[in-house]
Curated annotation (Swiss-Prot):
Its EC number is 6.3.5.7. The keyword Nucleotide-binding applies. The active site is at K78, S153, S177. This is Glutamyl-tRNA(Gln) amidotransferase subunit A. GO terms for molecular function: ATP binding; glutaminyl-tRNA synthase (glutamine-hydrolyzing) activity. It comes from the Bacteria. One of its GO terms (biological process) is translation. PROSITE patterns: AMIDASES. It comes from Thermoanaerobacter pseudethanolicus (strain ATCC 33223 / 39E) (Clostridium thermohydrosulfuricum). Transmembrane segments: none annotated. Heterotrimer of A, B and C subunits.
Amino acid sequence: MELYSLTIHELRELLKKREVSALEVTKSYLERIKEVEPKIDALITITEDFALQRAKEADEKIKNGEDTALTGIPVIIKDNISTEGIKTTCSSKMLENYIPPYNATVVEKLLEEGVIILGKSNLDEFAMGSSTENSAFKTTKNPWDLSRVPGGSSGGSAAAIAADEAAFALGSDTGGSIRQPASLCGVVGMKPTYGLVSRYGLVAFASSLDQIGPFTKDVTDCAIVLNTIIGHDPKDSTSLKIDKPDYTSYLKEDIKGLRIGVAKEFFGEGIEEGVKETVQESIKVLQDLGAEIIDISIPYVEYALPAYYIIASAEASSNLARYDGIRYGHIAGKYEDLIDMYMVTRSEGFGKEVKRRIMLGTYALSSGYYDAYYKKALKVRTLIKNDFEKAFEKCDVIIGPTSPTVAFKIGERANDPLAMYLADIYTVSVNIAGLPGISIPCGLSDGLPVGLQIIGRHFDEGKILNVAYAFEQANKFNAKPQAIGGAR
């Protein structure tokens, strides 16, 4: 068994017993990256020298008995999360050479724990997309089938974990950008409750929806990472003050008698038959474990997608106004006056999808259309939140498919934005309501991974992880991607 194929808790066991060193673990991952990265293109930056230096420091910590649950564990960070002294591009020409002078709060927390940063992962430009095809630099391939997308926008992070390029990765989720690629790549991906993890240092897309979360190889690892990255941060005005639980303590609780809601709206038109069948089999697994399955309805969830694209695009058009060519980022080479400089800078710096969303958002916020679009979308948001609250009166968690399809072919939806947007049809409502959700692999359809989404009440990550762990132990999904030469 190669070191790079192990989980966080397996690696920590070896590191604690001093059977391996953090340096050996890091070298194992760096070799793995050299082997598979040319095939999958998951990374924008590889920080080899920094990683080796950090590994030596981690070994010192372990030797002195100062290690924690993540000391010596290698991570990959999505390239829209600020890393001091390491390029943070957002996969955009606009920030192609931008090096942040500070770390995001989540990065700071990981570094304090002795985590080793191996590199930064590819994404859809400014996290806008569902396939990682919108990157200005490269298209990431799915390790299960190199002709298919890994999902998005955190496709680089998901593909990296599926291909064993790191023990875990960080992503951001605005409308499904952690859960959908986790589903398509057959890994665990969690979007925590809005406000639970600091957004300080995350390059903003839609500030009322964005949330940072982990990609891991199993549910136990997800709980371990969550323990470290949550917590109040005065630098983020939306960060919440709550008692920090130990999420690993929830994992082994019995789910007998737990009420699991199955919403009919998550099995409607557009879902692939193979995905539907695999998820229905998963529901049966949970029923056999003693959970009570309850049919529920979330009526307004069918309006979540249009409401999401209006709200997210409106916030993006405001957030991206800061890229003007003056303070940092790309600047036009030739221009006639100040207004021309703004226009040329933004025309050159932003890609097609980012421009599309800025235009959509600006239109929705314009005086003649504000009431008809943006205000209406905010009302729909409230209705969706209310629907979830009513549903949670009848059940403890809600489950369904993460994505209506398995990974689709690269280029297949490139010229059809609507088909691309539909990839997030089951995930956006969770962001709109600010709820926590996880995607865990539950089986294969046509040889490609299917994700099971588990949604909980606000701050009920413990219960979500409990259900996910119980399912994982019973289901024993252990298929591995073969397209890159039999990873894991």
